[in-house]
């Protein structure tokens, strides 16, 4: 009887070990039969979150202009875009005051702006622009504090200003709202930095336009969270040279898209790659 009890006890232990050990042997993310592979990292915050839908309500602000009629002085800027003509933004751009710029997270957002409540200087119609620069506060001034907090202000390119107001107005009251960005072609990824500090400028982003979260994946790595450096330049110190790269991008409205195999294994610095799809 004791022998039978021992045999039953041993079989019971073996069953427990099989239940406990076998799943562990597959490791994190392994596939069992037709099971779906677990993700490399936790989902990005706000992914496809309908509560973060674009706020398209109209708000009050002011607008001025900077640069010349050809866009002089509007190129480069605090969003990191560089040559706005080459990158597809052209003259339909504006620098935002501190209250709107949001430490660069608003770079790439699109707005519709119209001149209001000043019939002497306002022109009918509206303009649609992309945020590409920052209008810094000037705390030494006591008047004309257009870009100082908490003022909401758009410093438009001259070409855009002249579509909604007369030149001599200088500054006009406006109404503005966020609108979806309509861009041609795929999202663009421009490489900068060095092997130990990869920086990627992401531009030509449709939909909400402004990016809140970025991950990169080499063909030998999982998803790696990138840090916002300045404007829409995103960085990682993980060495990824020699690997093909994919990107996961989340815009401010919570929508996320995966851009697979954007860069081949032999990518280099100072190159621009087309993500082929857009928001």
Curated annotation (Swiss-Prot):
Keywords: Cell wall, Cell wall biogenesis/degradation, Membrane, Secreted, Signal. The keyword tRNA-binding does not apply. It holds the Pfam family Expansin_C. Its main location: secreted. Residues 1-27 form the signal peptide. Residues 76-186 form the Expansin-like EG45 domain. One of its GO terms (cellular component) is extracellular region. It is a peripheral membrane protein. Residues 196-275 form the Expansin-like CBD domain. Causes loosening and extension of plant cell walls by disrupting non-covalent bonding between cellulose microfibrils and matrix glucans. No enzymatic activity has been found. Belongs to the expansin family. Expansin A subfamily. This is Expansin-A22. It comes from Arabidopsis thaliana. The lineage of its organism: Eukaryota, Viridiplantae, Streptophyta, Embryophyta, Tracheophyta.
